[in-house]
Each structure stands twice: as structure tokens, then as C-alpha cells.
Curated annotation (Swiss-Prot):
Transmembrane listed as a keyword: no
GO MF, any single term: heptaprenylglyceryl phosphate synthase activity
Family of the protein in this entry: Belongs to the GGGP/HepGP synthase family.
PANTHER family given in the database record: HEPTAPRENYLGLYCERYL PHOSPHATE SYNTHASE, PTHR40029
Keywords from the named record: Lipid biosynthesis, Lipid metabolism, Magnesium, Metal-binding, Phospholipid biosynthesis, Phospholipid metabolism, Transferase
Organism: Lysinibacillus sphaericus (strain C3-41)
EC number, UniProt record: 2.5.1.n9
Protein name, per record: Heptaprenylglyceryl phosphate synthase
Length: 229
């Protein structure tokens, strides 16, 4: 399945433990893809471990790159975030330049997906690490979405609330502005009801932390998203 058609994504953190039994339930849940990525302590060993374990199942697997040292072949897609609301050029284009300089000769460009991130939780680790300006109005956020689609021509715009449940009005407003760029939503989903609500607006709903806190609740989000038109 092409990433443009994904509705539901389970995000696994390579720095967190997950049992084989729980991983099997995640991989056979009906989710569209397993997205591997994290902020802290992302290592090549962790990325390889999840790749090998998930490859036993039919579900596609993608890697969201946060550090050059943890890049490995074998994933179906490689998601490359550029943090549009960061004040640090490192997270907008410098790391990307370094990665292309090192791996450009062997990159399969059709496997790379550039995503414009807008981080909206001021207290999350990724906001602190990237120096993101999170005190944004809806107009600010919509402007970033327009910039992602019309200026940078990015295929994905990612609203990242990272640990807190976001504002559906913001997600709806952004979706109404995007015509070609796909809207990913991630952050704070702990129930099927929340997943269903965000699926009304976002093209793709990403479910992460709840996997490690309440697996049953996480699994229930798949049907909730898939049944939302």
C-alpha cells in the first residue's frame, strides 16, 4: 500500500521494549504500517531489532529518521522530517544535507518521504530538542500547512502534539487548506473515540505511546480509524 493511502499507523519507539506477543498483535491488527521512530536513545541496534522482528509479518515498515547513526537498509519507506516551526536550521535542512552528503550515492529516492512537521506541545521532548516555537495561533499553523504544500511541495504535513491530545479545530482547519499534501496527526490518542475524532479530519492517524500503556486500547484504534470516512 502506498503511504498516501495510509489511514492508521502504529508508531514504535526503538528505545522502548515490546514483547514478541504484543508485537505480533500490533503487526496483525490491520494497521496500514509500522512506523519506527523516537526522540531519545535511538540506536542502530534498536532500529535493526524492530526491523528484523516486524519483517516476520506482512505489514509494511517505515523508518522515521532522527539520527544519521541509526539509518539502515531494509525498510519500505524512510520518512525525513523537517521541523517547519523550529528556529534551528539544524532541524529544517542541516541534518538533511549531512545525510544526503553521506548516503546520497546509495539513496533510493522513491523510498524517501519528506514530511513537514509542526510541533504543538511545548512540554514535549521533541519541542525542546528542536527549538520549536509552539505558541502558535490557528492562522500560524494554517500558514505552515500552506507553506508545506505550496512552497516546499511536501507530500506530508504532520501535526505533532506528542503526548497530549490535540485540538480538533486546528486539525480541521489545516485539513480544509490542504489539497494535495496529506495530513498526518499524532499525539495523545488513548482511546478509540479520540482516534475516530481525529480520523474525521486527518488523512492518517498515528498512534504511539498508548501501545506501551494499554495495548487493548491501542488495538481498538485501528477499527475506529478504518471505519471513519
Amino acid at each position: 500500500m502506498d503511504y498516501l493511502e495510509w489511514r492508521h499507523v502504529f508508531r514504535l519507539d526503538p528505545a522502548k521494549d515490546i514483547s514478541d506477543e504484543d508485537l505480533e498483535k500490533i503487526c496483525e491488527s490491520g494497521t496500514d504500517v509500522i512506523l519506527v521512530g523516537g526522540t531519545d536513545n535511538v540506536t542502530l541496534d534498536g532500529v535493526l531489532d524492530l526491523l528484523v522482528r516486524v519483517r516476520r509479518f506482512e505489514v509494511p515498515i517505515a523508518l522515521e529518521i532522527s539520527t544519521i547513526d541509526a539509518i539502515t537498509p531494509g525498510y519500505d519507506y524512510y520518512f525525513i522530517p523537517t521541523v517547519l516551526n523550529s528556529d534551528d536550521p539544524k532541524w529544517i535542512k542541516n541534518l538533511h544535507h549531512a545525510a544526503i552528503k553521506e548516503f546520497g550515492d546509495i539513496m533510493v529516492w522513491d523510498e524517501l518521504v519528506a514530511e513537514g512537521y509542526c510541533i504543538l506541545n511545548p512540554d514535549c521532548k521533541v519541542a525542546h530538542v528542536t527549538g520549536a516555537t509552539t505558541d502558535l495561533s490557528i492562522d500560524d499553523i494554517v500558514a505552515y500547512a500552506r507553506m508545506a504544500e505550496n512552497f516546499f511541495k511536501l507530500p506530508v504535513f504532520y501535526l505533532e502534539y506528542s503526548g497530549i491530545y490535540g485540538n480538533p479545530e486546528v486539525v480541521s482547519a489545516v485539513k480544509n487548506e490542504l489539497k494535495h499534501t496529506k495530513l498526518f496527526y499524532g499525539g495523545g490518542i488513548t482511546s478509540a473515540k479520540q482516534a475516530e475524532e481525529m480520523a474525521q479530519y486527518a488523512d492518517t492517524v498515528v498512534v504511539g505511546n498508548i501501545i506501551y500503556e494499554d495495548l487493548k486500547a491501542a488495538l481498538a484504534t485501528v477499527k475506529a480509524v478504518k471505519n471513519t470516512l
